A protein has these predicted regions:
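Active-site loop/helix belt of alpha/beta enzymes
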Residues: 2-114
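Active-site loop ensemble at the mouth of alpha/beta enzyme cores that anchors a bound cofactor
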Residues: 48-50, 83-161
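Gly/Ser/Thr-rich active-site loops/lids in small-molecule metabolic enzymes
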Residues: 53-58, 123, 163-167
Length: 179
């Protein structure tokens, strides 16, 4: 919502698109998809809450505008693992699409939580083997970009803060070993 990615802008553009969908014989307008992806990895709970409050306000305005024009808006769906409690609290969302919680990626673990927030644990790991130890503080693994993604930063070695993955190619990863 308002992230300038997919879809149309909240407001009159969203209402116009909903009208076009409703007027098209093979299509059925089923509601709004409102995902605030940029809020998922904001580190502080207050930042995530503020971002979702703003997005929820926009979603409510569009939903209310549709209803004011006599259009049913049976579903407002969206949310994500990093913010789903905020969306649930908003009273706007009928459906939550949180999906990362089932495995939990490394980047979500850097989000700070409130005392009563749900804490999801990592449930999916990649097993890699050290192939070589070319220097005392560097090890080469048999897992690289074809085994893990780096779009949110390098993976972490589970429960080993002394090991840091610093480089990756298609088939190999490089670990730096601290003293």
């Amino acid at each position: 919502v308002g992230s300038n990615r997919c879809g149309v802008s909240p407001g009159k553009d969203a209402v116009a698109l909903a009208r076009l969908i409703a007027a098209s014989a093979p299509l059925r307008f089923a509601g709004l998809h409102c995902y605030q992806g940029s809020a998922q990895h904001l580190r502080l709970p207050a930042e995530r809450k503020t971002a979702i409050q703003e997005a929820s306000k926009l979603a409510k305005e569009v939903r209310d505008a549709l209803v004011a024009e006599g259009m049913a808006c049976p579903r407002v769906t969206g949310a994500g693992t990093g913010t789903f409690l905020n969306e649930c609290d908003s009273g706007i969302f009928d459906e939550v699409q949180a999906g990362s919680y089932i495995f939990m990626d490394r980047d979500y673990s850097e989000n700070q939580l409130e005392a009563n927030d749900l804490h999801f644990e990592h449930a999916l790991f990649i097993q890699a083997t050290v192939m070589s130890y070319p220097e005392p503080h560097r090890a080469v693994l048999d897992a690289g970009l074809k085994a893990f993604s780096v779009d949110s930063g390098m993976p972490a070695v589970w429960k080993r803060p002394d090991l840091k993955l610093t480089k990756a190619s298609d088939e190999h990863g490089v670990l730096e070993v601290s003293d």
